[in-house]
Amino acid sequence: MQTLCLRYRLFPTKEQTRKLEDTLETCRLVYNSLVNDRVFRYETAKVSVGRYDQQKMFPQWSKDFPEVKAVHSQVLQNVAVRVDLAFRAFFRRVKAGETPGFPRLKGKGQYDSITYPQSGFKVGASTVSLSMFGKPVQIKAKLHRPVVGTVKTCTVRRDGRKWFVCFSVEQEDEFLPPCPGAIGLDAGLNSFLALSNGEFVDNPRFFRRDEKELAKAGRKQTKTKKRSKERRKANKVLSRIHERIRNRRHDFVHQTARRLVNRFGVIAVEKLNVKNMLGNYCLAKSISDASWSMFRCVLTSKAESADREVIAVNPAYTSQDCSGCGYRPDGLEGRTKKKLSDRWHFCPKCSASLDRDTNAAVNILRLALNHSLRGTSLDGITSSQGKPVEAPAFRI
């Protein structure tokens, strides 16, 4: 069984939008009340409470406050679950010695989703029925693909001025036919990916492409008066640009991952610590724009659902070592290390000559096969010496 998230666009009327926003506002107030309740109990009596203890307060709150009564009971219980998860994450970070980040109160407009964990929703032919204010509300939806499988949860999310519904469904595994091919991937900034067979995936640079337009919209927004009509219009333009960048990046990452999963049975990637790499102020913006972490997460998810294997290896020295003979320029006895500006690999020992990123991708593939698939051949992706061989063009 596999769990998927199916996302659809909702088109609520003005009245339905008001009801959704009122529900979000009520859930925000309940969330803040639960956080304050935990803090108050600990400060006064040194007592730690769990989500089940706090959920027992909801029946009384429903009697005292009509706004709380209008919210479905399953949605209220999910609010308590979110508070509990926030505190659990806080204590986990404290125990690990990380910066803890105490759970904060949600400001107005900062609570953007509600979840029906078990009941309170129904999917129609072109509508989604949600239980709000004590009765079902039929909201028009664009169901661009059928909801196949067992629906476990339903989440309604506000994204700017748009509304979406997300269904978590369980489906039977649909594995792709077995594929013997193996490939190594080297993430970069000049090219988004370099493959061990000599192919490249261009870096689209979505943020860089719209950076000037984004800066112009930001300057225009700062010149408007707060809480004015002009400020709301400027915010709308700014959010649309960010949404466009996000959607383009999301589409590119998913399509690239899907093509790789369809072609290869074993995919070797680098285990990059992107958070530390962002400390380089010269490359931080480009690294963030490349979205390597998102790509690896999507690739792993698609590989699992297709019965493919993704192997992450330590990227240390993969760009320095020669993929043909293993020669490493350690800086001693004239062995000059390659700089970041050196984009071509030439080995003084075996005379191997190839692109620097392709050389790294071959080393990544060899590390993955040596550690996890001993005795497995490279199936035409690389030769026995580890040098790239010709392969069909990989176009995206």
Tell me the role of every PLM-derived stretch:
Residues 52-157:
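Acidic carboxylate diad motif detector
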Residues 3, 285-286, 290-396:
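Positively charged, low-complexity nucleic-acid-binding target-recognition regions
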Residues 34, 79-90, 358-368:
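Stable alpha-helical structural segments in soluble proteins, enriched in small hydrophobic residues
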Residues 1-76:
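Gly/serine-rich nucleotide phosphate-binding loop at the start of the catalytic core
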